[in-house]
Each structure stands twice: as C-alpha cells, then as structure tokens.
C-alpha cells in the first residue's frame, strides 16, 4: 500500500511529496503550500479536457475502422477517402500563412545546426555522458568504431595500435582539409601552429600557410607562440586541435597534434518517455531527481574503468583567448531539453479525489509538466550549488511533447504550460515546446499544429518508427500491410519527411527553431552512419537524433560538409508533397509472400519484441541495445516496439498469420533471446516455462491484443505487466 499525503483533492505518494518539498522546491522561492494548491487546481481543471481529447482519438479511430470495413472489397478511392477524413474532422483545413513568434530561444536551437542526443533520464551515468557530449574526441570516435577498417594490420586490439592510429590521424587531417582548409597547403604537412597578429600560422617543412578563410580562426589556449590548442569554426560549429608533443599520440605527430575535438551534441533530450520504464512514484522520483541534478549542476556518478574508480560530474564551460586578445567562453555542455510523456498515460504517483475521479491516477503528462518545469527553474539560475552551470542562457525551459494527435492536442499542451507557468511564477512563454511529428493526424495537420503553438514552438521533429506504428494502427482494418523493412521505401514516408521540412520552413523556422529528423538505431554500424546520415542535413534538417556521444561526434562531421541554412534557403517556398501522397496507405498489393518469408518476418518481429520487452518488464530498462535475429545490435525503445507489435497485430487481423503462428514464433525466439542475454547475471530466462514469464506474456499480449490498443501504443500493457512483476517481487 502506497503511503500518501493529502494536498487538496489529491493524494500524493510520500516519496514524491517529500522529494518535491525537500529537494525540488528549495532554491526556487516558491512556497510549498501555494505550489501544491496550484498542482491540485491544474490537475482538477485540466483532467476533463485531457479525457475529452482521448475520447476524440477513440471516436475518430472507430469511424475510420468502420469506413474501411465497409469498403473492404473495393479498392481505395483517394478522393472519397480524403473527403471522408475531412467530414469526420480528422483532416482539417490548413490555416492561412503565418510566421512563428517564439522569443528568448538559445542559439543552439535557432542558429546552430548539429546532432541531438536522446537519453533515458533514469540512468544518471548516461545522462551525465550526454550532457557532457557537447565536445567529443574525433580520434576516439574513429579509433573505437568501424569507420576505420581493421584490415591491413589496423585491428583495435587491447593496447594502442600505431597502424590504426595512423589511419585515424590521416582521416582527421583530411576532415580538417575539407572543413577548415589552409590556403595552398594541407594539414598533413603541418609541423607546428602559432598565432601572429591575430591570425593562425601553420608551419610547414620550408614555409608556412594561413587559413583559406582567416575568419575560421576562433581562438586558442596557451601562448600565441606555443599554443596548447587551436580553436576553429565552420558552419557555426567549433573544431579544437589539441597540441601536446609529449603525449603518446602527439609524440608521433609531425605537428605534435594529440587529438581533434569536435563540437558534437549541441542539444540533448533528457527523456521521461519512450526510453524509460517509469510505472510508479519510485520510478518517477528517480527520473525527477536526476533531472534536478542536471539543472542544479551537482549530478555525479561513480564510474569504474580499467579497475579505477572516479566520479563523473558535469563539465564546466571552455575558455579560450580570442584571436586578437580578450577571453572567449563557449558552453561546455549540451543544451538540455526534457521530454515529458504524452497525453495518454496516468500514473498513481498522484491520485485524485476530485468529483467523479474517485481515487483515479492522475494524467502523467500533467504531472511531468508541473514537476519537470519546477525543477528546470534551477537550470535558469546561477547559485552556490551550481555556480555558472545554468542550462538556458535566455531564460527558457525546453520541453519536448510527444505523441500529440492534431492541433487541439497541441493547444491543450500550450494551455497546460501556461497554467504551470502561473503556478511557478514564471513569465508567460518561458516553457517552450518541441512538437514531435510522429502521429498521422499531426502530420496531416502540421501547419495547424504549429500555429497552435506559434509563440512557444522551438522544434518539429519526424519520428519514423512511431509514425509508422500509427500508420499501421490507423488503417488496421484497411488490409494487410507490407513487411516492416519495406516501410522505409514507401511513398508516404518520403512525403512525410519532405512535408515536415517544407511546413517548418513556410512557418519561419529557419534561424528561429529546429527542424529535426530521426534516430540512427544501429549503434555499432558507425561506418554506415557516416555514409548515410548526411542525407538528413542535406534534406534541410538542422538536427537529427543519435544514440551515443560517439555517434554525435561522428554525425557532427556531416554539418561541416553541409551548410544546412543554405539548403533551407534553397528549399524555402517549395511544396514537394500532396495530401494524397501522405494518405497513401502502405498496403500489400498482393499476398505473394512465400511461407518461409512470412515465417522470417514473424520471427524477426517476435525476436525484436521479446528482446526489448524482457528487459523492460524484468529489469525496468526502457532503452536497450538489442541484438536482432542476425545479431546486429539495434537501439530499441517503445517506438520500435510499437511498429513491430502493430505489424504482427495487422497480419493477425487479416489472416496472414494465426494466433498459433505468433505463439509458436515467440516460443522459437525466446530461447534465442535467452542465449543473447546469457552474460547478464540479472537476466531471467523465459524458456522453457513461458507462461511463468511475465515478460513473455507481455510480448504475447502486445501482438494478440495489438489491434485493440489505443492508437497501437504499447504503454498500457507494459505498465500493467511491469507493475505485476514488481508486485510479485515484493510479495
């Protein structure tokens, strides 16, 4: 039984109540009683609106299901389909042209194009690493990944391999030549660096060279005659060449260069949503406490590496001498967003006894806005606790709001933020919103969604996986869908990605707000990422998601190769897609799959589902590197789970597979997943006692009940089964 404290109509879990009163409120100048009174009023006033929005989702889905069932034999008529969606209020009229008016936004969001990290807030070590990933070693990123081949004696090995190291140095020199070129010379031939009359001078064997563009020299450390580092700038991003002839690497380098540091994760999303498993008050407080530590600047974590233990803390800002003297200070940490949960889920960390509620758990999205907003106040202040470790330098709080369906839900978020600002005593407009364009009704009405948040919006971002999950679920009754791997090459996906950029640019995002694109999930395949992910900045995106600090450093190279703001200028005013393209349902044209192809698809998805769900349910891990059926490590979160479970639910609904096929595949894949996790002492095997494994049953639920889940979301089943496991463990 949860110990609770009454606060007006609310009963708050004591662990949350004490955390807020004893840790989050001190230092904010907010009175405890007035805060809880404000929480009570916001929850009581806004809960009915939240409920109405969810009812609208269900009503629209029911009408779409019915329409598809009635036309099941006929081919889909695009005009009739479009008219039907308009008639029921799913497809809305686009507003007149407008320009967003958001103000007080940091440069990292408005005028800097670069990588964006997303990390689970429940893991303090990951959160610290991400916040510190503003700067990363290019040498380390190259040496430790497959970007540099292990052929011809260049294996990683245990100790330093000079053959591999030389390949890294050559790669980095080429990057410098491409990004910050010298006039008539190459960094490969450099023998030293110095500063003369505010200009960079690079010594060569018999002569010297200057930068082709002297304006790219941004500063240095050490002395002008003997600098310890050289700071360069390109496309708004910084590159730092570290010089130390006494170091292991520098001693072998003609110019004494020991590393090249890239400005990497410009922004980071601290995630309370798809990458975490937070099902009760204890889980929520763990996340809130880590968010508090990041904002106060005192989050720390003991880390053991090579038998040595040290304490990891947040990096301080970086100071340089400007080219002509004076001091230049650059941020040492990534600018932090926080992703709240969406409008769907409730959490019994707080229950409400307001009229009609009868002890019902409170909507988690309302809670997150209140508590992450309160905590973020610490990141706006310079105090004894955090020194100068503030987050926003413009006084803004950045909240990513996921899984919104259409402009009414965006407007509700803005009303919620406004009410929270009143409770916290913050100026209206302090809490900015990042809109995830990951639900079909938002994609189709994106212009109206942006307009609903025109004075708060700081980013729009495509999320291919969730968006595909909603694509499948919305058209669940239309017929069987194509295979998961084929989804990326469909007409609607290209239209979706292009429309997001076009709509953002038309609303004045360039130079004012981020246009973002999705995650690279193959965490070990960095050579492929370096080759392919450049497509995102080339498409006009000022940011794109990466799964690790190393990936952020490697992806940063793309923003040196591509001037995103120049790309946006070329795209400005273009409309490259139509509503009909966005409405093209990815149905299989004919069921021409061989039995072995169907089995392969089902096994692949069942393995993916089990590999993620078993750690979610049994260990409370919401973001995992899960080996796929071919043992390729993939970064999985609830978005990947949604698409896998919805595809199988769709095939089940249309008789491509039976429930017996799904169960048989789960039983085939569970031993493989058990084997893949054999090295984890915390792991509990699912085979052979499948029906005793709550995780196995959760995976089965997600497939067999997938068609009935609200919008195909996985959270209701995951939360219920995780709480069941916690109850069993505590019994």
Curated annotation (Swiss-Prot):
Any one of the GO BP annotations: glyoxylate catabolic process
Family affiliation: Belongs to the malate synthase family. GlcB subfamily.
Enzyme Commission code(s) on record: 2.3.3.9
Residues that coordinate or bind glyoxylate: 339, 438, 463-466
Pfam families on file: MS_C, MS_N, MS_TIM-barrel, MSG_insertion
Location relative to the cell: Cytoplasm
Record keywords: Cytoplasm, Glyoxylate bypass, Magnesium, Metal-binding, Oxidation, Transferase, Tricarboxylic acid cycle
Sequence positions bearing Cysteine sulfenic acid (-SOH): 623
NCBIfam families for this protein: malate_syn_G, PRK02999.1
Gene Ontology terms for molecular function: magnesium ion binding; malate synthase activity
Keyword Manganese attached: no
Pathway participation: Carbohydrate metabolism; glyoxylate cycle; (S)-malate from isocitrate: step 2/2
Keyword Nucleotidyltransferase (UniProt): no
Residues the record lists as binding acetyl-CoA: 118, 125-126, 275, 312, 547
Cofactor(s), by name: Mg(2+)
Protein name: Malate synthase G
Role description: Involved in the glycolate utilization. Catalyzes the condensation and subsequent hydrolysis of acetyl-coenzyme A (acetyl-CoA) and glyoxylate to form malate and CoA.
Residue positions of the active site: 339, 637
GO CC, alphabetical: cytosol
Positions with a binding annotation for Mg(2+): 438, 466
Alphabetized CDD domains for the sequence: malate_synt_G (cd00728)
UniProt subunit comment: Monomer.
Annotated catalysed reactions: glyoxylate + acetyl-CoA + H2O = (S)-malate + CoA + H(+)
